[in-house]
Swiss-Prot record:
Record GO biological process: COPII-coated vesicle cargo loading; endoplasmic reticulum organization; protein transport
Pfam families documented for this protein: SRA1 (PF07304), WD40 (PF00400)
Domain of life, per lineage: Eukaryota
Protein name: Protein transport protein sec31
Native species: Neosartorya fischeri (strain ATCC 1020 / DSM 3700 / CBS 544.65 / FGSC A1164 / JCM 1740 / NRRL 181 / WB 181)
Cross-referenced PROSITE patterns: WD_REPEATS_2, WD_REPEATS_REGION
Record-linked SMART domains: WD40
Function: Component of the coat protein complex II (COPII) which promotes the formation of transport vesicles from the endoplasmic reticulum (ER). The coat has two main functions, the physical deformation of the endoplasmic reticulum membrane into vesicles and the selection of cargo molecules.
Protein localization: Cytoplasmic vesicle, COPII-coated vesicle membrane; Endoplasmic reticulum membrane
Compositional bias per record (Pro residues), positions renumbered to this chain: 992-1019, 1038-1061, 1100-1132
Region (Disordered): 488-511, 801-828, 840-1159
Record keywords, A-Z: Cytoplasmic vesicle, Endoplasmic reticulum, ER-Golgi transport, Membrane, Protein transport, Repeat, Transport, WD repeat
Amino acid sequence: MVRLREIPRTATFAWSPGAASPLIATGTRAGAVDVDFSNETCLELWDLGLSSQDASQELQPIAKIGTDSGFNDLAWTDSEDNSRGVIAGALENGSLDLWDADKLINGSSDAVISRMTKHSGAIKALQFNPKHSNLLATGGAKGELYISDLNNIANPYRLGSAAARADDIECLDWNKKVAHILVTGSSAGFVTVWDVKTKKESLTLNNMGRKAVSAVAWDPEKPTKLITSTPLESDPLIYVWDLRNSHAPERTLKGHESGVLSLSWCPQDPDLLLSSGKDNRTLCWNPQTGQAYGEFPVVTNWTFQTRWNPHNPNFFATASFDGRISIQTVQNTRTDTARAIADQNQALDGADFFAKAQTQPQVSNFSLPKAPKWLERPCGASFGFGGRVISVGLIEKGKRASKIKITPFEVDEAVAKSTETFENALKEGDLRSICENRASQAASDEEKADWKVIEALISENPRKGLIEYLGFQDQADETADKLAQLGLDKEDDEVNGESAKESRGSGAKKHKRLQSMFDANPEADNFLSDLAASKGAKTNNPFQIFNGSETEADKGITRALLLGNFEKALDVALKEDRMSDAFMIAICGGQKCIEKAQEHYFSKQTDGPNYIRLLASIVGKNLWDVVHNADLSNWKEVMAALCTFADDNEFADLCEALGDRLEEQIRSTEDKSLRKDASFCFLAGSKLEKVIAIWIEELREYEQKSIETAADDTSFSIHVRALQSLIEKVTIFRQVTKFQDTERTKDADWKLSMLYDKYIEYADVVATHGRLQVAQKYLDLVPEKHPEAEIARNRIKLAMRHATPQRSQQTVPTTRTPVNKPLPQASMYPAQPAFSATAAAPAAATTAPRNPYAPPTAATAQPVNPYAPPSAAATQPQTSNSYAPIGGGGYTPAGYQPLQPPTYGAQPLGGSVPPPPRASNQSPATVTTYTTATNLPAWNDLPEGFTKPPTSRRGTPAAAAATISSPFPNQSPTLSQGPPPPGAPPTQRAPSVPPPPKGTAPPPRVTSPPTNLPGPSPAANPYASLPQSPPMGSAMGVPPPASIPRGPSPYNAPPSMPPPSNRYAPSPAAQAASPQLSTRAPVPPPPHAAASPYASQPASHPPPANPYAPSTPPPSQLPMQQAPPPQAPPSRPSTASSQRKAAPAPPKYPPGDRSHIPSDAMPIYEILSADMQRVKSRAPSSFKAQVEDAERRLNILFDHLNNEDLLKPNTVADMAELARAIQARDYETAKTIHIDIMTNRTEECGNWMVGVKRLISMSRATP
């Protein structure tokens, strides 16, 4: 519960009616004395401003008017004639005053509606009728009870006679169901039920010896039930009555310690009742069962009035004689948790010791066992992701049991149908039929053209298909027809003595392609063969090579040909401009001569026909000239030339360039008809990034046009259909062209970003219709680094029950705890651990759902006796070790293991078996205390961030409990500690346990701490290293030599090393990482010990998995036999040499320097630091401490790499491989390498290894 606002007045009050922002009217309480002894009486109106979360400013009245006397009661009702209603005041001088609330707020001088003085004495109570707001009942001294009508306020009528009774009427209440029934309570103990219709009393309750009545209230739903209360200090009771049996109360509610002064029955929920009284308390009850739910914050004086808000029962107000009216809510804000966090945030050094005393007002927390009725719903429905509707309905009316139904839901059935049809067609693989179907159903010529082009690309020879689509398949025959019309194909009348007609054959077509213009003729076939001279053959046509009439050019050509010098002959022919001769010579001379002849020919034909330039581009393989310079009206001819002659490696770019020219013309001329031509070019060149922009523009235009013309379709249906068509075109196009997206690995600046947005939108649409797998398929086409796709993918995977990082808060089973919990007693002797002859396995524990950012959760302790000293675990051990100190058993972090209290009558462990002796320089064993978690959520918790938790004056990170083993911040604590020797008094004694508190604790006081008693133990850091597991050997093993010191465990720091008292001192784990920092020689183990008798206690409740929690290695093998108690080692002589500290070796380079990291180790630094920054930027702010701790540990690794110490070359190589695995998000490989290093190279591991472990877990959990 939280106190939302406070009005600094000692006054009676009334809530404003209606659903508007709540106002409160206050009237100075009659008989009350202010702190300044003012005798001013007034009526004030207050705006609570509940819409603002800032509750720090003191409220000021928005209206105020003086009165002649103090108030005993106030009422506020709706009125047809007054917009904000009418306020009625019961004054001490017997006057009944009425005010217009709207005029009061506006500051009008005529706010007073009327003033009536029918009562001869003080008016003690008044109330408007809930059914007829114009009827007002007033009761006061001498038994006077009047009913007033606001429409005729001057003529009230009285109920009862003056002679009937002379006691004062203290309270009254209208029946909530029967409008003419009224109940009154008097100082003489009479509880009378009146029938206003007959103006007579109906009955009088037998009020248990005529005890005075301070408050009455009717049940809001049952017309025959009411409650009464007595103001007597000796008998502060609340009676529940049923008028069907008026001789005795149905139930008696006992909870107040002094007289009850006020009651308020919630109008919206008959199971909620508020009561306040002289014991300064406000209680919440269930009057139907008599159960007391709890109490609200205790004040310092009587609480004389409490009222629910009539419209919003989440709020209620309580007035007390300490000068405050508190406006509160029934919702829980988990104040105990906030206070515990504030205590943990206090600094651990002496500067803030006294700052831990909290000065906040005392509060009480309780949770209602069931939701209030106004929060219950008989039925409800919610749309769920994935095309589901979750509906809740009652199984049977009147019973508090409901059933849940999950049914599929589709916004538009056509969407699901078209999606399913398309996906099935894709599975069948008949792409041509899809294109034909979509082209026939196309809504525009542009869309139809797109599908036709895609269909043309399906053929085995796509270029030929494109040429045929452009209409060039019959161009040869058409050209032949035109030549025939011009008479250019006429031949001589006779060929070899035969007419041309006869030579062609009678059945031949008149015009054919060039290759078929000559019919088969045997003589013609033998023509060339006849020309070839066979061996020994003679001819009748002699000739001379030189006849004397030749020109010099002829002679030069002849001589060159005779010698086979075709290039020289070509040069002469070209020089003489004999082009026909030159081409024939070039054909004989080979490719080089042909290219030379072509080049000369084209250079001479610069002003020739257009086909010459086209031929030049084709022959010179320079189609860019045609693409960039040909007129765009002939773009089809250009496209045909590209399809015919372009090389495969240039074809796509040439098509794109032609499409770009068409787009430029579209922008310059605004001729949108050219868009389909540009689309053709981009489709032919497989340029999806270019055509998608045109398609999206067409999609928008189609939507706008369809919305304007559609009669029945919704805008959503139109948009989804257009989007479906776009996705289908893109999908088919990608399959036909085997399009490969090369930008999926990029982080930004994608060419297909517009398409990616449509993919994400389409995935959301189809997922909403229940097609999750289809949605996932299209999201897989979007780059992994796309921020919106990443969110959508996680959402889809969650809906499909795939494993994804969970960021929700842990749900812990709620248990009911007392309001004031006693502090657990801390014992200076350790609890007995349970040892087993076999390897210990942690007991199965119920863990909350995994949360990668949640801090470790303490195990649940068994609540047996909070005042008994702690004892051994409840499990029965097979063999017990009485001398094992308490520690992080089973690799559980210190501070998380519960102390199991014994049952009543159990003897404290400290007095049962004497502990073993300890060395003279050893410190007492660390004592771990356990506090039950109190941050358990309830149904009525306020939303996150509604209230601001209290913060300490210093921003020291929170830490859990542990003892300070050394008063000097820079001194390294001993690695092994034990309990005090037998018979010797302990160094510290735990304070005695206080008796159980009575009732609610009073407000806290600030006191000085005792000077000779130990101060509060600072909390052990929950994010520090785990306790070290002692080395385990075989049952009959030989102890290791004392001269070989054991370094700290590669997994955790020793359990006896708490954080130093100075917040700026190095961490103990860092101090213990180097053997030179040890303050004393290691103590050898006791003789004949199979293993260390100070083994850690195995944890019975392992903590939940948490990437930010310290790593938890598997449990160690426990010894097979129990070792006897060790003997005390001899005390060392006090010499200067033994007390001298070993000076730590200074590092080669200062911490933070990264300039000397070797090249082979540089990838470790670059990759891990970059990934750490990624995690740091995305992790929730509430887990800042965990992230910073991991970063600090990584910096230790980087310092080692910079100094080239600790890590061997093979470890550096493995760490580089681990870093690359993290970069590739191959966390399993990284984890395997990490475990291998920790297992096989423990001497190279330190605090940095825990940082690497946490980074792997956090990186995996961070999207």
